[in-house]
Amino acid sequence: MAHGRQQDELQDITLLGNQDNTYNFDYRPDVLESFDNKHQGRDYFVKFNCPEFTSLCPITGQPDFATIYISYIPNVKMVESKSLKLYLFSFRNHGDFHEDCMNIIMNDLIELMDPHYIEVWGKFTPRGGISIDPYTNYGRPNSKYEQMAEHRLMNHDLYPEKIDNR
């Protein structure tokens, strides 16, 4: 019979339920929090749809807006969603190219969780008539997840989208 989490399992979760939040406008990977995956014997995806991502162009300082999709197959740890929200918010004044932001996010989440598999896909709104949609992924080396990452990378965008995909 399934039961809820015990208090000692939640002691490292400090942001969820906390009404006294600090919204950092500068990149803060240390705000990320994790909790234990209680279903380690099962492969399953966790997907976050993050439609309000903002960062800055490193050259012009102009804001860039995106929807970010983060999908992962957890191992031992999972990312806590409120900490992820605050972490993504911390990119608000971070100046970097779209591709860099997606790789930074993926690397920080790998460091936090050590997932079996993870992918991060940014769908940025057009600037100058061009939208940029960087996709990055990772599968644990020497495992089926590494092969999965290779396959998904090669096939991630087989169906080109229409211009009205935003």
From Swiss-Prot:
Pathway annotation from the record: tRNA modification; tRNA-queuosine biosynthesis
Main location: cytoplasm
Positions of substrate binding: 79-81, 98-99
InterPro entries found in the cross-reference section: GTP-CH-I_C/QueF (IPR043133), NADPH_dep_7-cyano-7-deazaG_red (IPR050084), QueF (IPR029500), QueF_type1 (IPR016856)
Compartment list: Cytoplasm
Catalytic activity: 7-aminomethyl-7-carbaguanine + 2 NADP(+) = 7-cyano-7-deazaguanine + 2 NADPH + 3 H(+)
Alphabetized Pfam families for the sequence: QueF
GO molecular function: preQ1 synthase activity
GO biological process: queuosine biosynthetic process; tRNA modification
The entry's keywords: Cytoplasm, NADP, Oxidoreductase, Queuosine biosynthesis
EC id: 1.7.1.13
GO cellular component terms given for this protein: cytoplasm
PANTHER family the record matches: NADPH-DEPENDENT 7-CYANO-7-DEAZAGUANINE REDUCTASE (PTHR34354:SF1)
Function in brief: Catalyzes the NADPH-dependent reduction of 7-cyano-7-deazaguanine (preQ0) to 7-aminomethyl-7-deazaguanine (preQ1).
Family: Belongs to the GTP cyclohydrolase I family. QueF type 1 subfamily.
Name of this protein: NADPH-dependent 7-cyano-7-deazaguanine reductase
